[in-house]
Swiss-Prot record:
This is Protein SHI RELATED SEQUENCE 5. GO terms for cellular component: nucleus. Zn(2+) 1 binds at residues 125, 128, 136, 141. Residues 125-152 bind DNA. Belongs to the SHI protein family. It comes from the Eukaryota. One of its GO terms (molecular function) is DNA-binding transcription factor activity. Disruption phenotype: No visible phenotype. Its main location: nucleus. NCBIfam families: LRP1_Cterm, put_zinc_LRP1. It comes from Arabidopsis thaliana (Mouse-ear cress). A motif (Required for homo- and heterodimerization) lies at residues 269-272. The lineage of its organism: Eukaryota, Viridiplantae, Streptophyta, Embryophyta, Tracheophyta.
Length: 346
């Protein structure tokens, strides 16, 4: 419910009691009435504007309308000041951080004018109280400005984009994202191919210079069933003199019945020392007699042929010939992983 609250004004009768002219008293009486202020509260239409202070000219407009029309050209209108504080939100909002807009309207004797001071946020519409456009000179929202017929350039501009343009823009963005993803995948695949190609080139470079030596050294022993490949830096077969020492081996429990005899040796092959122990494999007539170093009659016939092949491969590469590589030797001269025992002391 709307209501008026009288606030009162200053009385200037003490300053003008001595004036005798009737016109002066009339003007003085009008000036006293203009000094009265009324507090206007509108709880129905302007819920979010709170209390506003207005001069009595707004409420006495119909009463003095004829007098103002008669005195329009004779004298200037009376001075009045109006101000109000408008919160940006509704009155039901309990947020203490609401921005408020303080506006003043000043009408002087010569030129009317107005200005608005905004603090911590935008202004409210003067008609509906909603958020007003920031650059609107009429301080109204888009709907009220349009309904009143104001030619506001701020409300003409709009950031709304048609649906067709929005779809076109989204399609362009999707195509760009797909293109960028495909280009990244292509670059990654190219890098992987370059990396694998570089490794293959390195292998070709390493194998190109020593082609004949690699062909001679990477030979699988046909006599053995293990199928192991010989190292690139070691000859496939070696014949070298060696000293075998007879040693006594036993189990961990050191049982006398489990004691046996074996031979320990160490040979130099290709600049590497190979040590091991040869265990007793049984009588010579068994199937594994070729593992014994004493039965080497079959391998001695291939000494000249193996030496010729090795010398030919080494001469092509310009490498120094290792004398130990000219003689074949059994690949199973020792068993890897066997313990090493020192010769018994005498």
């Amino acid at each position: 419910m709307a209501g008026f609250f009288y606030l009162g004004g200053r009385d200037n009768n003490s300053n003008n009691n001595k004036q005798d002219h009737h016109q002066v008293d009339k003007d003085h009486h009008h000036q006293d009435k203009s000094n009265y202020l009324y507090l206007y509260k509108d709880e129905i239409y302007n819920n979010n504007k709170g209390f506003e202070i207005w001069p009595p000219q707004y409420f006495q407009q119909q009463e003095h309308q004829q007098q103002q029309q008669q005195q329009q050209h004779a004298s200037a209108p009376a001075n009045f000041y109006s101000f109000g504080m408008v919160p940006s939100g509704s009155s039901s909002n309990n947020n203490n951080n609401r921005s408020r807009s303080l506006y003043f309207n000043v009408v002087s004797d010569h030129e009317p004018g107005g200005f608005t001071v905004t603090r911590q946020g935008g202004m409210n519409c003067q008609d509906c109280g909603n958020q007003a456009k920031k650059d609107c000179p009429h301080m109204r929202c888009r709907t009220c400005c349009k309904s009143r017929g104001f030619h506001c350039q701020t409300h003409v501009k709009s950031t709304w984009v048609p649906a067709a343009k929005r779809r076109e823009r989204l399609a362009q963005l999707a195509s760009l994202q797909h293109h960028s993803a495909s280009s990244r995948e292509t670059q990654n695949a190219k890098r992987l191919r370059e990396a694998s190609g570089g490794d293959n080139n390195d292998d070709k470079d390493h194998s190109g210079g020593g082609g004949s030596a690699l062909a001679n050294t990477r030979v699988v022993n046909a006599n053995s069933n293990s199928g192991l490949e010989v190292s690139q830096h070691l000859p496939p077969e070696v014949n070298s003199p060696a000293i075998f020492r007879c040693v006594r081996v036993s189990s961990i429990e050191e049982d006398e019945d489990d004691q046996a005899y074996a031979y320990q040796t160490a040979v130099n092959i290709g600049g590497h020392i190979f040590k091991g122990i040869l265990y007793d494999q049984g009588p010579e007539h068994q199937d594994n007699h070729h593992l014994n170093l004493l039965a080497s009659t079959a391998t001695t016939t291939n000494v000249e042929e193996t030496a010729t092949k090795t010398v030919t491969g080494n001469n092509n590469n310009g490498l120094m010939l290792d004398p130990s590589s000219l003689y074949p030797a059994q690949l199973n001269s020792f068993i890897a992983g066997t313990p090493f025992f020192t010769p018994p002391r005498s």
